[in-house]
C-alpha cells in the first residue's frame, strides 16, 4: 500500500520564517519523521510530495527513508498510490485520485468538504503522520 504525503501544511504547520539574510526556515515535528519510518517498517511505501524548491525539506526528510518528489503540478504524479494526505487546493488532484484521503484538522474548508475525506485530529506539523500510524494499524486488515 502506497501513501502520498504533502509537505507544507501536513508535515509542517505551514509557517515560514525568513531570517535577515533572506533564508527560509520551516518547522517539522520529529515525531512525524519517526512515524514515517514506522510506516515503512510496517510495509507501506511512503512518497513525500512538495511543490517547494526549498532544499531544507529534502535535507530533513531524506532521513525518513521515504521517496521525495519535487512536483509543482500534483496532477502529474506518475506513481500509483492508494492513500493521500493533503491540506490545500494544490492537493486536490492528488487527493481525488486516492482511494482513501486524509487531511489535518486545520486544512482548508474546500479540502475538508471533498467526498470521502477523513479529517484527522492533528493539525499540520503537529503529529499528522503519528496519527496515521495509529489509524493504519487499526485499518490495516480492512485495506
Model-found features: residue ranges?
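Alpha-helical substrate-recognition element adjacent to the catalytic core
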Residues: 1-73
Amino acid at each position: 500500500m502506497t501513501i502520498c504525503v504533502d509537505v507544507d501544511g501536513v508535515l509542517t504547520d505551514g509557517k515560514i520564517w525568513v531570517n535577515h539574510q533572506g533564508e527560509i526556515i520551516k518547522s517539522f515535528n520529529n515525531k512525524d519523521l519517526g512515524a514515517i519510518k514506522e510506516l515503512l517498517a510496517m510495509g507501506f511505501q511512503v512518497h513525500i510530495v512538495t511543490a517547494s524548491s526549498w532544499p531544507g525539506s529534502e535535507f530533513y526528510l531524506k532521513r525518513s527513508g521515504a521517496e521525495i518528489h519535487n512536483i509543482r503540478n500534483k496532477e502529474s504524479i506518475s506513481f500509483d498510490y492508494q492513500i493521500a494526505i493533503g491540506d490545500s487546493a494544490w492537493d486536490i488532484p492528488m487527493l481525488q485520485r486516492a482511494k482513501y484521503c486524509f487531511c489535518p484538522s486545520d486544512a482548508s474548508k474546500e479540502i475538508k468538504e471533498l467526498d470521502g475525506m477523513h479529517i484527522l485530529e492533528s493539525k499540520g506539523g503537529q503529529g499528522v503522520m503519528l496519527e496515521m500510524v495509529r489509524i493504519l494499524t487499526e485499518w490495516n486488515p480492512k485495506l
